[in-house]
């Protein structure tokens, strides 16, 4: 058994799936493999991920048994009956999603819900109400929202209700107010209870519009998670990126709001440099999913992996023997796959510390809570039921 670490960093490469899992066919995603298909279409430059052992999980070449990974690496199969951000992150912290939240991709949101939303949106007429790409719907409808004081509402293959608002014409505060009201309305009936209401601010004019990083997610409030246990044990919980929104601020001590993946990695690097103790740093890198997976931009996805690998190298340099790093993912989103939605896939688990003596390949593991259990055991807490306990294998 390895020693206890003073700090644990968990980085979620949002949507970085690694191929088939036990439920892939039932989700209609047979053949999806996000990382492999990106690698087949883009010449990845990833010396740090290779050093840690990514090629044991997915590679263009036959597995090389002579590879000596510097981290423990394994594949995880999710337990939850879902393939979305909320289900993935919640499972990491101890909550299994057995029944997926409703989605509205076939017919849009029902008239009764639309009427309730329009009342809450100061009488603005809702336009859109369809399954759409966020960037595409702005091209079609943003001018109407601005000129007529209407409001774009749309959904995605995930369980979401997304609301657009121009930062100048509508104003961020109004957009956030509408999104909070929509969360309350959706939560009032089980048939409307989407996993997330998302405020999608944008800027621009004359047909040229860009979404900004002032996005906010309003999720259902989870029951108590491992984060609560950490907080009660006086371990500082630090949320970087979307993490605070995903857990509705519950049991989060310090928040670094969503930014680019590079900027979120920079936050992790700066935290590591402080050499403080008793910290759990939970990082989400959303651009893999939002900018490249959903948009089916395989080259962009590859470039983002390269950028992540470069920042990963900087992080590895500043981590000490007293730090533990976990890299994983919440679901897949294969940019070569038909459609624009998430893909059900196996997910990576990479566990690294300079203190490890002889890291090795792990067997396939059941439950994203496996990563959470590493955190729990490190800080002397009770394990969670949504994953396996591999702590005693880390040496």
UniProtKB/Swiss-Prot annotation:
Q: Which NCBIfam families match?
A: deoB, PRK05362.1
The signal peptide here is none
Q: Which reaction does it catalyse?
A: 2-deoxy-alpha-D-ribose 1-phosphate = 2-deoxy-D-ribose 5-phosphate; alpha-D-ribose 1-phosphate = D-ribose 5-phosphate
Species per Swiss-Prot/TrEMBL record: Mycoplasmopsis pulmonis (strain UAB CTIP) (Mycoplasma pulmonis)
Identify the metabolic or biological route this protein is part of: Carbohydrate degradation; 2-deoxy-D-ribose 1-phosphate degradation; D-glyceraldehyde 3-phosphate and acetaldehyde from 2-deoxy-alpha-D-ribose 1-phosphate: step 1/2
EC main class here is isomerase
Q: What is its EC number?
A: 5.4.2.7
Q: Where in the cell is it found?
A: Cytoplasm
Co-factor requirement: Mn(2+)
Q: What residues bind Mn(2+) 1, as annotated?
A: 14, 330-331
HAMAP family found in the cross-reference section: Phosphopentomut (MF_00740)
**GO terms for MF:** magnesium ion binding; manganese ion binding; phosphopentomutase activity
What family does the database annotate? Answer: Belongs to the phosphopentomutase family.
Q: What GO CC terms are in its UniProt record?
A: cytosol
Relate the protein's function as given in its record. Answer: Isomerase that catalyzes the conversion of deoxy-ribose 1-phosphate (dRib-1-P) and ribose 1-phosphate (Rib-1-P) to deoxy-ribose 5-phosphate (dRib-5-P) and ribose 5-phosphate (Rib-5-P), respectively.
Gene that produces this protein: deoB
| Protein name from the UniProt record | Phosphopentomutase
Cross-referenced CDD domains: PPM (cd16009)
> What remark does the entry make about the cofactor?
Binds 2 manganese ions.
The UniProt annotation places Mn(2+) 2 binding at 289, 294, 342
The alphabetical list of record keywords is: Cytoplasm, Isomerase, Manganese, Metal-binding
Among InterPro entries, the record links this protein to: Alkaline_phosphatase_core_sf, DeoB, Metalloenzyme, Phosphopentomutase_DeoB_cap_sf
Could you provide one GO biological process annotation from this protein's UniProt record? Answer: metabolic compound salvage
């Amino acid at each position: 058994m390895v020693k206890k670490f003073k700090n644990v960093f968990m980085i979620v490469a949002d949507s970085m799936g690694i191929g088939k899992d036990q439920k892939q066919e039932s989700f209609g995603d047979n053949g999806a493999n996000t990382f492999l298909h990106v690698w087949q279409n883009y010449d990845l430059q990833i010396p740090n991920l290779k050093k840690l052992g990514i090629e044991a999980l997915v590679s263009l070449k036959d597995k090389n048994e002579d590879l000596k990974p510097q981290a423990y690496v394994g594949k995880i199969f999710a337990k939850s009956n879902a393939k979305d951000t909320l289900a993935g992150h919640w499972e990491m912290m101890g909550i299994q999603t057995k029944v997926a939240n409703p989605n509205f991709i076939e017919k849009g949101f029902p008239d009764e819900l639309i009427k309730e939303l329009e009342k809450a949106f100061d009488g603005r007429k809702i336009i859109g109400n369809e399954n759409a790409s966020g960037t595409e719907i702005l091209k079609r409808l943003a001018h109407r929202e601005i000129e007529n004081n209407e409001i774009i509402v749309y959904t995605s293959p995930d369980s979401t209700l997304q609301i657009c608002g121009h930062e100048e014409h509508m104003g961020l505060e109004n957009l956030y107010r509408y999104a909070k009201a929509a969360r309350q309305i959706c939560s009032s009936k089980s048939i409307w209870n989407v996993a997330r209401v998302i405020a999608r601010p944008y800027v621009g004019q004359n047909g040229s519009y860009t979404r900004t990083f002032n996005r906010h997610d309003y999720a259902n409030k989870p029951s108590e998670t491992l984060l609560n246990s950490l907080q009660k044990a006086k371990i500082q919980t630090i949320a970087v990126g979307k993490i605070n929104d995903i857990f509705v601020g519950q049991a989060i001590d310090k928040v670094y709001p969503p930014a680019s993946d590079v900027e979120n990695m920079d936050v992790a690097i700066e935290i590591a440099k402080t050499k403080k103790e008793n910290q759990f740093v939970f990082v989400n890198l959303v651009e893999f999913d939002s900018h490249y997976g959903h948009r089916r931009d395989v080259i962009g996805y590859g470039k983002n992996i390269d950028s992540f690998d470069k920042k990963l190298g900087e992080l590895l340099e500043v981590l000490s023997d007293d730090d533990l790093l976990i890299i994983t993912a919440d679901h897949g989103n294969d940019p070569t796959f038909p459609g624009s939605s998430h893909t059900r896939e196996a997910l990576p688990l990479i566990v690294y510390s300079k203190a490890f003596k002889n890291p090795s390949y792990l067997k396939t593991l059941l439950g994203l809570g496996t990563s959470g259990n590493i955190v729990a055991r490190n800080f002397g807490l009770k394990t969670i039921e949504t994953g396996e306990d591999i702590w005693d294998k880390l040496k």
